[in-house]
């Protein structure tokens, strides 16, 4: 029984490591045209940021055996990574409106979804998905790591567009895509 528990923890930690490695490889593939920020690839920096936010939030979540801020941390990660991408790419300083509009669309979406999920979990007092997960340090860690991957991959199209040296052009395709968000 004792060895089985160790094997499960090692398997969960191996999955978490595999998730990070997979996402890192994905980031390297998609960021071939990314600008550098302070000497390294911006998309790669954002990847690390997404995971570090998750891992830092995991610590108090595991200590207190709570999932109450899991979803809001995901939203915060979307917002933080997009704001960092906009800042590091010079979007605000150079008024790259296409970058700013894409960033704002994701930020508004993250605030909307995050506040809904946060209010839901505080109303319900728990999220049943986590009942068996939050008691296992490795399974809970794997779950937080998966959220880092989820945030990075879901926002990767916007991140690589913002991190492109040319920025995001405002044209008919841009307007069509931006309008789809409001549907």
Where is each model-derived feature located?
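Membrane-helix interfacial "entry" motifs
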Residues: 4-8, 34, 38, 42, ...
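Structural signature of hydrophobic alpha-helical transmembrane segments
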Residues: 37-51, 99, 103
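Intramembrane catalytic core of multi-pass membrane enzymes that act on lipidic substrates
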Residues: 63, 67-165, 175-177
């Amino acid at each position: 029984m004792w060895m089985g528990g160790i094997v499960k923890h090692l398997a969960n930690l191996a999955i978490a490591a595999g998730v990070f490695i997979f996402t890192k490889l994905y980031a390297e593939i998609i960021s071939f045209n990314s600008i550098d920020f302070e000497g390294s690839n911006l998309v790669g920096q954002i990847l690390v940021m997404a995971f570090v936010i998750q891992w830092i939030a995991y610590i108090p979540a595991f200590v207190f055996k709570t999932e109450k801020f899991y979803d809001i941390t995901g939203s915060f990660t979307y917002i933080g990574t997009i704001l960092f991408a906009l800042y590091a790419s010079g979007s605000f300083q150079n008024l790259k409106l296409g970058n700013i509009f894409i960033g704002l669309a994701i930020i508004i979406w993250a605030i909307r979804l995050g506040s809904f999920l946060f209010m839901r979990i505080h109303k319900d007092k728990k999220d049943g998905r986590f009942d068996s997960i939050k008691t296992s340090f490795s399974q809970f860690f794997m779950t937080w790591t998966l959220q880092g991957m989820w945030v990075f991959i879901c926002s990767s199209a916007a991140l690589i567009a913002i991190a492109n040296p040319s920025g995001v052009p405002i044209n008919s395709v841009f307007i069509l895509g931006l309008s789809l968000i409001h549907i």
